[in-house]
Regions:
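Conserved N-terminal phosphate-binding loop of PLP-dependent enzymes in the Aspartate aminotransferase
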Residues: 2-397
Length: 397
């Protein structure tokens, strides 16, 4: 007799474009830090939809806010103002310390907007159209053409060339490498504050502060991608705040909506006053009342439930348990990360096999790069959840 999961998977393969090698489970519902498949099997989730579900699944106050907004209005377009967009922007500006917001539908759209901001800022200064952006090797910013162009991984890029021009790559955490790429054409430097897909590499403090200084000295815009590492994940609302570094442009998404598709790029006052104007950029769905009601409630719940404080409190316990695994197993060579964005580097044991075995054992974890086991759980995890994760993970080695 065919299982329920197998039936759904077979149907999916008939109609859904094969752009993912999906694991062979069909998830149906979630509660707290757990997901359940159509067979009723429970999974402890340390992936959080790839760092999306900061508040966990089915938070009643979050769900109610969405239901309430559905009963009012979901979409109006950017031809008009709407209250949820205003409130969400106010909260994002306050949390980030920046000045103006443009809401998008995703992280990759936010990156596209940030690239346009940098180019327009430089164009207004000198009237030239041959400006350059410096990006980082092993970075990941998205798969649309502009975002792909600043992604430092030829594997993703090669089939889609030619990409947009004027992009140069420097080594992450190597300030001299960045300096060597700067010319009078450089309009922006884009980097993740913590590299995610590249293998969970936090920026060195000296590096990110040095890049900020280079940008100030050369009137170059610093674009920080906080799509994965932002929204409390590292123990600060945004990871750059832990370094005492403010970007000119910041991109965010993922946990910004905690499941509702939404992204944003946020500008400081200098950049907002000297870049995009009406007609330069637009979106049909970006800033819609439904998505912005989600964003607004996320910020409310972060404050009400003291999410950032909890991340700071729980992080040492997670790091202690992961460091113990490094000591115990020869094939785990190092732990990297900040807050609840952690990676274990595996040597001689394929990370994909561990991820698959973990699923069998009721644990959801994911990979980063070629050999890193990535842990990006909901930010509401407890010590008991961490203990259970360690137990299930060890069974998966």
């Amino acid at each position: 007799m065919m299982s329920c999961s197998k039936e759904y998977i077979d149907r999916a393969e008939q109609v859904i474009l094969h752009t993912y090698n999906r694991f062979q489970i069909v998830l149906e519902k979630g509660q707290g830090v757990r997901l359940y498949d159509v067979e009723g099997k429970e999974y402890l989730d340390f992936a959080a939809g790839i760092a999306v579900f900061a508040l966990g699944y089915n938070n009643p106050k979050y769900s109610q806010a969405l239901k309430d907004q559905i009963d009012k209005v979901i979409h109006t377009s950017n031809l008009y103002y709407n209250i949820p967009m205003i409130e969400a922007a106010e909260k994002l500006v306050k949390a980030s310390g920046l000045s103006k917001v443009f809401f998008t539908n995703s992280g990759t759209e936010a990156i596209e907007g940030a690239i346009k901001v940098a180019r327009k800022y430089a164009y207004l200064k000198d009237g030239c159209t041959d400006h350059e952006i410096i990006a980082m090797e092993h970075s990941f910013h998205g798969r649309s053409l502009g975002a792909l162009s600043v992604t430092g991984n030829t594997h993703y890029q090669e089939p889609f060339k030619p990409l947009i021009g004027g992009v140069k790559f420097a080594k992450f955490n190597d300030l001299e490498s960045v300096k060597a790429q700067i010319t009078d054409k450089t309009c922006g430097i884009i980097m993740e504050t913590v590299q995610g897909e590249g293998g969970i590499y936090p920026a060195d403090p000296e590096f990110i502060k040095g890049v900020r200084k280079l940008c100030d000295e050369n009137d170059i815009l610093l674009i920080l991608d906080e799509i994965q590492c932002g929204m409390g994940r590292t123990g600060d609302m945004f990871a750059c705040q832990g370094y005492g570094v403010m970007p000119d442009v910041m991109t965010c998404a993922k946990a910004l909506g905690c499941g509702v598709p939404v992204g944003a790029f946020v500008l400081n006052e200098k950049t907002a006053n000297a870049s995009l104007v009406p007609g330069d950029h637009g979106t049909t769905y970006g800033g819609n009342p439904f998505a912005c009601a989600a964003v607004s409630k996320v910020f409310d719940l972060f404050e009400e439930e003291k999410i950032v404080e909890h991340v700071r409190q729980i992080t040492p316990y997670l790091e202690e348990k992961l460091d113990a695994l490094v000591e115990k197993y020869d094939f785990i060579t190092i732990r990297r990360g900040k807050g609840l964005m952690q990676g274990l580097v595996l040597e001689g044991k394929p990370v994909g096999e561990v991820v698959t075995k973990a699923i069998e054992n009721g644990l959801l974890v994911i990979s980063a790069g070629s050999n890193v086991l990535r842990l990006v759980p909901p930010l509401v995890i407890t010590e008991a959840d961490i203990d259970e994760m360690i137990e299930k993970l060890e069974k998966s080695f």
